[in-house]
UniProtKB/Swiss-Prot annotation:
GO terms for biological process: intracellular protein transport; vesicle-mediated transport. Keywords: Coiled coil, Cytoplasm, Endosome, Golgi apparatus, Membrane, Protein transport, Transmembrane, Transmembrane helix, Transport. Vesicle trafficking protein that functions in the secretory pathway. Disulfide bonds: none annotated. It comes from the Eukaryota. GO terms for cellular component: cell plate; endosome; Golgi apparatus; intracellular membrane-bounded organelle; membrane. Residues 1-314 are cytoplasmic. This is Syntaxin-31. Residues 164-181 have a biased composition (Polar residues). The keyword Translocase does not apply. The gene is SYP31.
């Protein structure tokens, strides 16, 4: 059974080539390459493009802040991603600073466009609402970042206090252990279970023949305990620099977090000032709208009064009809 479909791709290509030759299909990139067409674009297109870019940037920044919050919650004293958190914090801070500057430029562009006076009240209200929404979202993202950094700072302080508590507790508990280790233990040759005790005793030279046996045992135990004490001191000397380096790194990270919080606190007054200016602009727009409504009502009342005067003036209506009849007579008898 044969196929009921027919391949007409060649016909489609030939038709498109024919239409291109006769000029029925304009070039796709004609408007993009023509500078005059870009100048003829709508006045609010640049404002809308910038506003959309700022909105997209705020969305991406909020996603980064959410990731930073997850890292700050997952980090513990044994799994601390300090470097990654610092890099992400610096990146978010730069994004917020750039968005703040872009929002200031957008507001400047709005004021320049509104100064021309070629916009309706609906367009002015739209621009104002867009700017207010972007400012509110940026302020919310900044507040969220400040909360995350505050939580991070509190967690770091809690970890540092816990570490200091445990280190102090270990330092207090360590002296009894050293004293317990320094208690002299009986040497192996003093035990009756050592079968080679009689052979080892002649090999040891007597330290002092006139000294009692107890003093010799204490000297031997002190000599045997000396290497263990030296080993403990060496381990302690190796551990202390590591703890100091870790404490210094934590202190630097805590200082950087506090500095970021201070910088974000400096951004809030700028946003508050911008919101206040936007509110004043909205109040002025409302006042202008009230004045426009008053003027419209006055014009409407004046037109109604004029209409009443015209409708009540019959002599004027008779004059108008007389002029119309005279025109018809002149046209019919002299022109026709």
């Amino acid at each position: 059974m044969g196929s009921t479909f027919r391949d007409r791709t060649v016909e489609l290509h030939s038709l498109s080539q024919t239409l291109k030759k006769i000029g029925a299909i304009p070039s796709v990139h004609q408007d993009e390459d023509d500078p005059a067409s870009s100048k003829r674009s709508s006045p609010g297109s640049e404002f809308n493009k910038k506003a959309s870019r700022i909105g997209l940037g705020i969305k991406e920044t909020s996603q980064k802040i959410t990731r930073l919050a997850k890292l700050a919650k997952q980090s513990t004293i044994f799994n601390d991603r300090t470097v990654e958190i610092q890099e992400l914090t610096v990146l978010i801070r730069n994004d917020i600073t750039g968005l703040n500057m872009a929002l200031s430029d957008l507001q400047t562009l709005q004021n320049m466009e509104l100064a021309d006076g070629n916009y309706s009240q609906d367009q002015v209200g739209h621009y104002t609402a867009v700017c207010d929404d972007l400012k509110t979202r940026l302020m919310g993202a900044t507040k969220q970042l400040q909360d995350v950094l505050t939580t991070r700072s509190e967690n770091m302080k809690a970890h540092e206090n816990r570490k200091q508590l445990f280190s102090t507790k270990n330092a207090v508990d360590s002296p009894p252990q050293n004293n317990a280790k320094s208690v002299p233990e009986p040497p192996p040759w003093s035990s009756s279970s050592n079968p080679f005790g009689n052979l080892q005793q002649p090999l040891l030279p007597p330290l002092n023949t006139g000294a009692p046996p107890g003093s010799q045992l204490r000297r031997r135990s002190a000599i045997e305990n000396a290497p263990s004490q030296q080993m403990e001191m060496s381990l302690l000397q190796q551990t202390v620099p590591k703890q100091e380096n870790y404490s210094q790194s934590r202190a630097v990270a805590l200082h950087s977090v506090e500095s970021r919080i201070t910088e974000l606190s400096g951004i809030f007054p700028q946003l508050a000032t911008m919101v206040t200016q936007q509110g004043e602009l909205a109040i002025r727009i409302d006042d202008n709208m009230d004045e426009s409504l008053v003027n419209v009502e006055g014009a409407r009342s004046a037109l109604l009064q004029h209409l009443t005067r015209i409708s009540s003036n019959r002599w004027l209506m008779m004059k108008i009809f007389a002029v119309i009849i005279l025109f018809l007579i002149v046209f019919l008898f002299f022109v026709a």
